Amino acid sequence: MTTTTADHNISAQQKAVEENLVNRVLQSFDACENPRLKQLMESLVVHLHDFIRDVRLTEDEWNYAIDFLTAVGHITDDKRQEFVLLSDTLGASMQTIAVNNEAYENSTEATVFGPFFLDDAPEVELGGDIAGGAQGQAAWIEGTVTDTEGNPVPNARIEVWECDEDGLYDVQYADERMAGRAYMHTDANGDYRFWGLTPVPYPIPHDGPVGNMLKAVGRSPVRCAHLHFMVTAPELRTLVTHIFVEGDPQLEIGDSVFGVKDSLIKKFEEQAPGTPTPDGRDLGDQTWARTRFDIVLAPGA
């Protein structure tokens, strides 16, 4: 298999040595009986070797890269997934989402999953409060889940999770409390509604190797304010997405994981103290916000 690299005035003999090595590695996969695995490994080798040859990678740089990935592994545990952060900050997560979620008519766009999802969040009734003691400005979020033909999707499962006003998720606290997350099901009309918190921008964990990488290249570790959604329903494509906050200054600076899409930016309308709430909840002298996020699910594969 022929590969391509930039011309670095390398001698023909040296090019032949490098090309021969690539071909030998590729031939090592000839006995692989899994066609997809063989394709993945061959493409990975070609692109990896092309990168090494293109930048003329030094041995010190390669050893540094190995140490970096080792550090990523060491800091990863059941509460912190540094490899997800690395994938996100390099845009690899969003690129994978892009190739696997081809735009379908008017379906809601997908974005990154993130490292803070838990699969054992509590269930709340429609209109319930997902905050669970997390602090922040109360926000009423509502919408309707439909398919691409406009039909309501009853009993769709909606998982939501978000940070508190300090930009921290529940899993980042030592007390192992569960807050700022829950799941619910749409009603017969496909409607959902709940109390949450107005999202705020926050930095991804940047006290580890990924944070060091961002600092070295002059990038901000801050994510734009957002609220996570995962929506599932039979025979429809599972949707992982966010809603972002219109007017968030971080939108102009940029999202550290490249997750923002214009269609997902929603206005959180701030309500004055004493403004009646949709469900009659008494918030006293507090301001609160409300937004609407209608969700359109694409057909399943």
Curated annotation (Swiss-Prot):
Annotated TM spans: none
Gene Ontology MF annotations: 4-hydroxycatechol 1,2-dioxygenase activity; catechol 1,2-dioxygenase activity; ferric iron binding
EC category: oxidoreductase
Binding-site residues for Fe cation, renumbered to this chain: 169, 202, 226, 228
Disulfide bonds: none
Gene3D superfamilies in the record: Aromatic compound dioxygenase
Enzyme Commission number(s) of this protein: 1.13.11.37
Record keyword Oxidoreductase present: yes
Cofactor(s) recorded in Swiss-Prot or TrEMBL: Fe(3+)
Catalytic activity: benzene-1,2,4-triol + O2 = maleylacetate + 2 H(+)
Any GO BP annotation: catechol-containing compound metabolic process
Keywords: Dioxygenase, Iron, Metal-binding, Oxidoreductase
Functional pathway: Aromatic compound metabolism
Free-text cofactor note: Binds 1 Fe(3+) ion per subunit.
Keyword Ligase: no
Function as written in the Swiss-Prot or TrEMBL entry: Involved in resorcinol degradation. Catalyzes the conversion of hydroxyquinol to malelylacetate. Also shows weak activity with catechol, 3-methylcatechol and 4-methylcatechol, but cannot use 4-chlorocatechol, 4-nitrocatechol or protocatechuate.
Family of the protein in this entry: Belongs to the intradiol ring-cleavage dioxygenase family.
Name the record gives this protein: Hydroxyquinol 1,2-dioxygenase
